Regions:
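N-terminal "mature-domain start" segment
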Residues: 1-37
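Generic beta-strand structural signal
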Residues: 5, 123-124, 156
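Generic detection of long, well-ordered alpha-helical segments
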Residues: 8, 67-71, 140-144
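His/acidic/aromatic-lined binding-pocket segments of jelly-roll/cupin-type domains
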Residues: 12, 120-121
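Surface-exposed amphipathic alpha-helical segments
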Residues: 16-18, 129-157
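Phosphate/oxyanion-binding loops and surfaces in catalytic or ligand/nucleic-acid-binding neighborhoods
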Residues: 21, 69, 157
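Conserved polar/disulfide-associated segments of primarily extracytoplasmic proteins
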Residues: 24-117, 123, 128-129
Length: 157
């Protein structure tokens, strides 16, 4: 199994069935091409996952102590997906790589497909690490189980 690095904070042993996305898939899924991000796909379940890391400015770092990073990401996702029938289902919290992660689950429509997404954010000082997944709603139960296996495989550096 392939060992991957997420930013400067986490590693991931790619679980069975997942593989890194190709450049063509990155373009198709509108994923940034950067050393600070990676994308994974599990074709059997049509799961697309992306992870990324960024450091924010000192000013934004101060705001992160006032505004929840997960709430900020949720506002951004809801704005970006407004034309796709975005609907938040619930807030989420869990550990990823031994760190507290806050997130949310939502639904949206992509073409004729009803989709489910989850996003998590880990804040550490001025660093933010993001974890996102997108999967068809008809595969929700098995897809979210695979997603949780992937998140369970994340380790802190």
């Amino acid at each position: 199994m392939e060992q991957l690095t997420i930013g400067k904070r986490f590693t991931l042993t790619c679980p069975e069935g997942f593989r890194p996305v190709t450049k063509e898939e990155r373009d198709r899924f509108h994923m940034p091409e950067s050393d600070d991000s990676l994308g994974l796909i599990r074709e059997d379940d049509r799961i697309v996952a992306s992870m990324g890391w960024k450091e924010v400015s000192a000013f934004a770092g101060v705001l992160l102590h006032v505004i929840s990073p997960a709430a900020s990401v949720e506002a951004s996702v809801s704005r970006d997906m407004a034309g796709y029938g975005y609907r938040k289902e619930k807030s989420l919290s869990r550990e990823i790589g031994g760190q507290k992660a806050e997130g949310f689950r939502y639904t949206y429509t992509a073409g004729d497909n009803f989709m489910v997404g989850e996003s998590y954010v880990i804040r550490s000082g001025r660093s933010l690490t993001f974890f996102h997944v997108y999967l068809p709603d008809e595969l929700r139960e098995q897809g979210l189980a695979r997603w949780n296996e992937l998140l369970d495989a994340v380790q802190s550096l």
